[in-house]
A protein has these predicted regions:
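Active-site helical microenvironments for divalent-metal-assisted chemistry
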Residues: 1-142
Length: 142
């Protein structure tokens, strides 16, 4: 089994029974993010970006599954710390180059979900603004 397939399997199990802001299965949020990013490592991180925060997974367990230190570090960067405010979280996540594209896709998807569900959107807009102003990168060739 490839690392990408294993990441999807882990995320599907970890988020079983969880729902996104619109009431859909949470794994669909992870899949939308993976569909948005470009590289294989970004896709793996996309599937796993919330497994530490929203389930019983740990860094050590992900490492034991054979995910590279770079992937595990990116997942850790995308894991909110206790007492961490939204904007500090965005900045910390974006400081990890592998996590940055995933965080952007995550914020964009959360913004769409919040809009569809009639929920507040300001924190997602502000997070995207921080990425645009403080972490702007030239577009990647396609």
């Amino acid at each position: 089994m490839s690392h990408l397939e294993r990441a999807l399997e882990i995320a599907t199990e970890a988020h079983d029974g969880q729902r996104d802001k619109t009431g859909r299965p949470y794994i669909e949020h992870c899949e939308r993010i993976a569909d948005t990013v470009d590289t294989l490592d970004e896709k793996i991180v996309s599937y796993l970006h919330d497994v530490i925060e929203k389930s019983g997974w740990t860094r050590a367990r992900l490492e034991a599954e054979g995910f590279s230190p770079a992937i595990v570090s990116a997942i850790d960067a995308l894991t909110r710390r206790e007492e961490e405010d939204d904007l500090s979280f965005v900045r910390r996540a974006a400081s990890n180059p592998l996590a940055r594209a995933v965080k952007r896709a995550d914020l964009e998807d959360n913004l769409r979900q919040a809009s569809a569900a009639g929920l507040p959107q300001a924190k997602y807009r502000k997070g995207l603004e921080i990425l645009d102003k403080e972490f702007r990168e030239p577009p990647r060739p396609r």
